[in-house]
Amino acid sequence: MLLATFKLCAGSSYRHVRNMKGLRHQAALAIGQELNWRAPGGPTQSGWINQVRRQSSLLGSQLEDTLYSDQELAYIQQGEEAMQKALGILRNQEGWKEENQQANGDKVLSKVVPDVGKVFRLEVEVDQPMERLYEELVERMEAMGEWNPNVKEIKVLQKIGKDTVITHELAAESAGNLVGPRDFVSVRCAKRRGSTCVLAGMATQFEEMPEQKGVIRAEHGPTCMVLHPLAGSPSKTKLTWLLSIDLKGWLPKTIINQVLSQTQVDFANHLRKRLESSPAPEARC
């Protein structure tokens, strides 16, 4: 209902949003009324995806007094749509096939999703509290290049409100130069619903960051990471990472599958080392 209310007031796509002058205040009022009507509640352990998907909204956090520009509203909506679509993919348990299984229990699954393509799903358990992962993956996002060798640099280009950012990511070349230099411009949003945190995003356009010479501009499809405390062990975290990506260029599917599944496995290993080697800050998701 909330998303429908926003679409009615603010337009349902980037092209429409550009033409909605004078409607931002109307959208904010309508969304505010809808948020006031909703009763808060936390997700159960068995239905966390459904709960997050149901409660997530374009302005699910408390509305701020400052009204957003048309462009900013378009980015916020795009981030919300990426989150909803990614959670919908995770919610469907059918058709997943194992790509990679590690001795420590980490595993990568994959499936082909209509209108999206092949997606990869990493499932791991991390011996750290959820707030610690959130701090590293969101608050310290720009430091990822320090501990993840698959990432050269992540830069926040624009921050919109509390939940949404536009980022530029420069990926490192893969081992053996199987995949050359790629970069990504993405809209990302982070939300918490009860005991679950969701970090989502997808490719977007940002005029101040055009394509770079010698680097192929790849694109993230609807992507997300879901964090929630492990059942019975609140000091540990279950991390699920849905990866949807178009590397562009002429690459055999076998190479793409190998690179992406290994990238997820490597990410989990590097993240654990980072969390173990760096001090735990006081953070809240």
Swiss-Prot record:
Intrachain S-S bonds: none
Localization in the cell: Mitochondrion
The reaction(s) this protein catalyses: cholesterol(in) = cholesterol(out)
SMART domains in the cross-refs: START
A Gene Ontology cellular-component term: mitochondrion
Gene Ontology terms for molecular function: cholesterol binding; cholesterol transfer activity
BP term (GO), one: cholesterol metabolic process
Keyword list, A-Z: Lipid transport, Lipid-binding, Mitochondrion, Phosphoprotein, Steroidogenesis, Transit peptide, Transport
Domain START: 67-280
Superkingdom to which the source organism belongs: Eukaryota
Alphabetized PANTHER family for the sequence: STEROIDOGENIC ACUTE REGULATORY PROTEIN, MITOCHONDRIAL
Protein name, per record: Steroidogenic acute regulatory protein, mitochondrial
The protein's annotated pathway: Steroid metabolism; cholesterol metabolism
Functional note: Plays a key role in steroid hormone synthesis by enhancing the metabolism of cholesterol into pregnenolone. Mediates the transfer of cholesterol from the outer mitochondrial membrane to the inner mitochondrial membrane where it is cleaved to pregnenolone.
Pfam families: START
InterPro entries: StAR, StAR-like, START-like_dom_sf, START_lipid-bd_dom
Entry-annotated residues carrying Phosphoserine: S57, S195
Species of the source: Equus caballus
Complexes and interactors: May interact with TSPO.
